[in-house]
UniProtKB/Swiss-Prot annotation:
The protein's annotated pathway: Polyol metabolism; glycerol degradation via glycerol kinase pathway; glycerone phosphate from sn-glycerol 3-phosphate (anaerobic route): step 1/1
Enzyme class: oxidoreductase
InterPro entries: FAD-dep_OxRdtase_2_FAD-bd (IPR003953), FAD/NAD-bd_sf (IPR036188), G3P_DH_GlpB_su (IPR009158)
Catalytic function, reaction form: a quinone + sn-glycerol 3-phosphate = dihydroxyacetone phosphate + a quinol
GO biological process: glycerol catabolic process
Record-level Gene Ontology MF annotations: glycerol-3-phosphate dehydrogenase (quinone) activity
Family under the similarity heading: Belongs to the anaerobic G-3-P dehydrogenase subunit B family.
Protein name: Anaerobic glycerol-3-phosphate dehydrogenase subunit B
Keywords: Flavoprotein, FMN, Oxidoreductase
Gene name per UniProt: glpB
Length: 419
């Protein structure tokens, strides 16, 4: 099977890369093993929240300039501030075109409220998520009886520290009892599958309506809206106060929705989606990827003109830690890492951990190297890249988006030259 590009990994980076390549008229396939890290995320995307020295970032342009000085090997630093902002804006346009109407500005970070009621700087958020400063003084944090994925009293306690009048309440929906037989089934995603049925919408409205008359804003867990935000908008039009949603413990309704919107758009535009499959071997001849062998296709290789590695980091098995060191399991690409295991981590758990910055070594075009030699038609994007700390620096989503589009543009340019 011949393709212009085969992408190994169907997470945020892989999907955005595929969508951008389709804009250039290239035929793409995505091989994906299972759920991506988006399923376990908040559904919000960070661009740059903090510098390596710990200084918080609000002005993104100034932050990117400072990052170039502090971390010259960071994926952003390799591109330059203006290029990062341009690619981030293009990514936001792609996301909106896919139906993910995310709120945010590439020039200025905003503060979203977290499930614990604290604030976190971010780039893009779903319109349901409350953003600081809140537009209300009287707030009620509402939990769902029996739902362990969200603790209303913890969020309320944090918000009270910001001089807000915050109460808590709990709604009980007997219609959800069918899920209570097994505690592991009473999760936000399973509740959403039930409540998203239009016949159930009035039940949720009836439960929230008495609470809404005594406050200016309701904050509740994101336990509906798995496909779209239609129910949220329907409730906001009818309730006498604003309704906002907070992501819950994973799996996350907002994260799954974002992934599904991107995946559906990729397929709608003619992309080949290969779920439940796994790349077992890549044939590389004279520094060029010629064949990709997958578990489900056995002796039928995929033959791409270009290949993209978007396999993620440790969480997605894109990187594997062993006693001898860190390795990239598909091709055995060169990996940036510390010399000894003792240097992998810091003693204090909440300190920035060195292992977070481990990843494949690439050139400035994000082409990785194998035994010191660049693989000419292979690009590495997203969390598998080295040189950045997605947690401490708050840049995970941004690096995925920016590197994906940079690789896509580079591939499209080279593909045009070869025709």
């Amino acid at each position: 099977m011949k393709f212009d590009t085969v992408i190994m990994g169907g997470g945020l980076a892989g999907l955005l890369c595929g969508l951008q390549l389709q804009q250039h008229g290239l035929r793409c396939a995505i091989v994906t093993r299972g759920q991506s890290a988006l399923h376990f995320s908040s559904g919000s995307l960070d661009l740059l929240s903090a510098l390596p020295d710990g200084q918080p970032v609000t002005d993104i342009t100034a932050g990117l300039d400072a990052l170039c000085r502090q971390a010259p090997e960071h994926p952003y630093s390799r591109l330059g501030a203006q290029k990062v902002l341009t690619l981030a804006q293009q990514a936001q346009t792609l996301l909106n075109a896919s139906g993910a109407q995310l709120y945010g500005d590439v020039q200025q970070a905003h503060q979203r409220v977290t499930p614990l009621g604290t604030l976190r700087s971010t780039w893009l958020s779903s319109p349901e998520v409350p953003v600081w400063p809140l537009s209300a003084q009287r707030i009620c944090v509402v939990g769902v009886s029996g739902l362990l994925d969200f603790q209303a009293h913890l969020a309320a306690a944090s918000l009270r520290q910001r001089d807000l009048n915050v109460e808590t309440a709990e709604i009980d929906l007997p219609e959800l009892d069918v899920l209570r037989d097994n505690p592991t089934e009473f999760r936000a995603v399973n509740i959403a599958r039930l409540l998203d049925n239009e016949e159930k919408w009035p039940l949720l409205y009836d439960a929230l309506s008495p609470i809404a008359t005594n406050c200016d804003m309701i904050i509740m867990p994101a336990c509906f809206g798995l496909a779209n935000d239609t129910l949220w908008r329907w409730l906001n039009e009818r309730l006498p106060c604003a309704l906002t949603l907070l992501p819950t413990l994973p799996p996350s309704v907002l994260g799954i929705r974002l992934h599904n919107q991107l995946q559906r758009q990729f397929v709608r535009q003619g992309g080949i989606w290969m779920p439940g499959d796994e790349v077992k071997k890549v044939t590389c001849r004279h520094g060029i990827v010629s064949e990709i062998w997958t578990r489900n296709h056995a002796d039928i290789p995929l033959r791409p003109r270009f290949a993209v590695l978007a396999s993620g980091s440790f969480f997605s098995s894109g990187l594997v830690a062993e006693r001898e060191g860190i390795r990239e399991p598909i091709l055995g690409l060169d990996v940036q890492q510390t010399a000894t295991r003792a240097e992998w981590y810091q003693q204090h758990f909440f300190d920035p951990q060195p292992w977070q910055q481990f990843g494949v070594v690439t050139d400035d075009a994000f082409r990785p190297s194998l035994a010191g030699n660049t693989v000419e038609n292979l690009y590495a994007i997203g969390s598998v890249l080295a040189g950045f700390d997605p947690i401490a620096e708050g840049c995970g989503g941004g690096v995925c988006a920016v590197s994906a589009l940079q690789a896509a543009h580079h591939i499209a340019e080279r593909a045009g030259e070869q025709q």
